[in-house]
Amino acid sequence: MSLLAQQLATLTAILPEFSAEQQAQIEALLSEANIHQSPLWAGHMTTNIAPATQLGTLLATIHNGNLLSAELYPQLVDIEQQLLQWFCQHFQQNQGHFTHGSSYGNLEALWQARDYSNTDTKIVYGSQDVHYSIIKACQILGLNFQAIACNMQGEMDKVALQKACKQHVPLAIIATVGTSSTGAIDPLNACFELAEQCHAWCHIDAAWGGGLALLDQLPDLSRAHSICVDPHKAFAQARPCSVLLYQDDLPALDIATHYLSQTPKRVLAGSYGGELFLPLWCSLLLTGEQALIRHIQNRLAQAELFYTLIKQNTNWWCLHSATGIICFRPEQVLFNHEQLLQDGILSETQFNDHTVYRAVFANDTCQATQLFATLFKQ
């Protein structure tokens, strides 16, 4: 702790050395970041960061160890393994590793699916609302992504998926737990069953909705081959904090790396350290798992309240999701439309060829009652 205190003292000591112009630049950045603290912030998945998480970010910066040379950092390795075991327990997988985000995780999972497939097919199925990183990954890997239509709830239509699988057996099926657009959850059990019938890889992109696993609100996930989760979205953690979990072990790379004591695993990431997981570790260490669960429950409760307020007080079209995103469409554009979008209070998306408003409850500080009242301010 003395080293941490010394670092904090050093930071405090250099503050008076900043010129007025430098201080103004720093203040402008801090002021810009305050947008995430607002009880009206519901435009996007960026969260406010708790003090315990901020401490973990500072610890990672001070430590700065590179786990490609894991033998030098046994404490860091131990913390990483503790967290991975925690994730595996909640998501019913057997091993995994941290990544810089689910865009990287989705690419790696499809890489594994492609290279370990016993078929010649290159087709990957996912919903029409699948995250764009899946489409990018398929382009990079030479795979053929084919979108499956969604139902009126924004979920992948399981009948359409079944029909597609009968016509062309896929290499992989992507199931999303919390689409970025509407927060919808694809029919997981149907995806598992079809993947098993087709001997295809089933990957779950739970970047946004993975927090539901902590609430025991997801089905048996052990049938998935791989799962991505982004704590920097649903767990209110600092970026980057993402994890990619696998049901089966990964082999080592068949590449000579004479300067390393251990042969790297066949994963996308190279150099990394505590920046990917120490903030989350600090959060769990200092506030506990139950605090994280309460955070998820509180933000989902506010999303539910916001949906209820719209249904009880308007005749607007409104779409509720279990992951904390509420989409709605008033009869006419809101009076303060531009300000709502500019201030990050709401965002827009497309649903069934209509432009709709989107409220993302990423923070448990977002207050549904205040947010609803803001819609009618002139």
Feature roles, as predicted:
Residues 56, 81-85, 107-111, 135, ...:
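Predominant activation on well-ordered alpha-helical scaffold segments within soluble catalytic domains
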Residues 69-77, 99, 103, 177-181, ...:
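Short acidic-aromatic active-site loops that bind/stabilize oxyanions
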Residues 101-254:
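Conserved PLP-enzyme active-site core in the AAT-like
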